[in-house]
């Protein structure tokens, strides 16, 4: 459940700070600028992640977020830059925002066409190179909180 899972993930992040390598806090103004650039409104859990951590790594788990204000000239792990780049290069649908790259052809995205009861988008899989009509958009997590908790637990070896 979104906020509860998110709070559990944050607690684990705080307990294991030696694994944290995050960009750092973003301002509310920068988050709003990112939303405008992507034409979405971020869910509360992802917004809190951006405001608190920005983007970065927990061990080997890299969560995309906001790196800097210049979204056109940024790089990984900037979710805004990478999403805009993929929209241009591979026709990534505008309802998807990339938050994680598996290292292969698969990316995990917030899907703003699949909102849960608290207006939290599901996290779905998008495979580069697969035509849009053949994408399955497998649900990886019901929301960002669940997704973040999964990734943090995976890094810690907790089931």
Language-model features, listed with the residues they occupy:
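Ampiphathic alpha-helical segments that act as solvent-exposed interaction surfaces
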Residues: 134-158
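N-terminal non-cleavable signal-anchor helices
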Residues: 32, 124-125, 141, 153
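Short, intrinsically disordered/low-complexity patches at protein termini
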Residues: 65-68, 82, 131-134, 143-146
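Low-complexity, compositionally biased segments
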Residues: 73, 81, 98, 114-116, ...
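Compositionally biased, low-structure terminal segments
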Residues: 43, 59, 127, 145-148
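Segments surrounding the PLD/"HKD" phosphodiesterase catalytic module and close analogs
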Residues: 109-139
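A surface-exposed partner-binding patch
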Residues: 1-107, 152-159
């Amino acid at each position: 459940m979104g906020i509860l899972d998110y709070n559990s993930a944050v607690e684990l992040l705080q307990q294991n700070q030696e694994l944290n390598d995050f960009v750092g806090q973003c301002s509310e103004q920068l988050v709003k600028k990112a939303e405008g650039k992507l034409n979405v409104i971020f869910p509360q859990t992802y917004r809190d992640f951006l405001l608190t951590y920005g983007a970065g790594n927990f061990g080997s788990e890299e969560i995309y977020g906001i790196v800097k204000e210049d979204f056109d000239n940024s790089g990984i792990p900037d979710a805004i830059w990478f999403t805009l780049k993929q929209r241009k290069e591979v026709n990534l649908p505008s309802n998807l925002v990339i938050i994680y790259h598996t290292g292969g052809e698969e990316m995990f995205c917030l899907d703003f066409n699949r909102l849960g009861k608290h207006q939290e988008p599901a996290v779905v899989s998008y495979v580069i190179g697969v035509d849009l009509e053949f994408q399955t958009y497998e649900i990886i997590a019901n929301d960002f909180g669940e997704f973040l908790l999964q990734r943090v637990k995976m890094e810690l070896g907790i089931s």
